[in-house]
Amino acid sequence: MLNRGGRWWPYEYAWQGDQVRSKYGKLINLYLEKAATTRNSMTGEWLKGYPAYVPVADSLGRPIEHAGATLHLITSRTILHTKSRTISNYWLTAIQPENVIEIHPSDAARLGLRDNQRAWILSATNPEASWDLGNGIRLPIVGRVMTREGIRPGVVNFVLGYGHFAYGALDVVIDGQLVPRDPRRAAGVHANAVMRLDDYLRNTGLSDVVGGSAVFYDTKVVLVPA
């Protein structure tokens, strides 16, 4: 059953007349009064109380420009790691020592990239492809390219859990004694620092003004061979 992807009804059994057979038995709010009676704290405009498509914008509602970048950057998870806390588990890093920059083969061919070639990830608000740690150290945002048919053309993906600058990934001096870094903990790439900044706030990424969460899937980037 698992090999088939699940257990399924015949298509015709899913319907009773013009309605679905398995109905959702609870209340579904298509209009949310709490949202509709709340103002956007940045613009003063009323929020929508109903489902609507809202184009990507900064905190003032202004459209986002991507400076010619065309590849859509997204993130994903790997079954081997949590978001960040398991890079110290060497049983797991032995299975997959680093993550990769995943792109579709058609994009790789168009950009002149090949499997295992390293590439920089640049964006409109991080054209230098570097992560400024604020202590005089800047880390390059560069990783190994891997093509995959399972990713949509025009999309760039990296899995979370790699590309650390802490957790022992860099040298640390404690009470005058050097604690040397472990290169295994720094392996791979973490491209969060490439993600688009809010043009008005400037020191934070784009955010969902209704829910308050960070926007991880609306940055467009450029890949440059390293």
Q: Which residues fall in each region the model found?
A:
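Long, low-complexity segments enriched in small/aliphatic residues
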Residues: 1-89
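Long, contiguous, secondary-structure-rich segments that constitute the structural scaffold
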Residues: 1-4, 13, 17-24, 30, ...
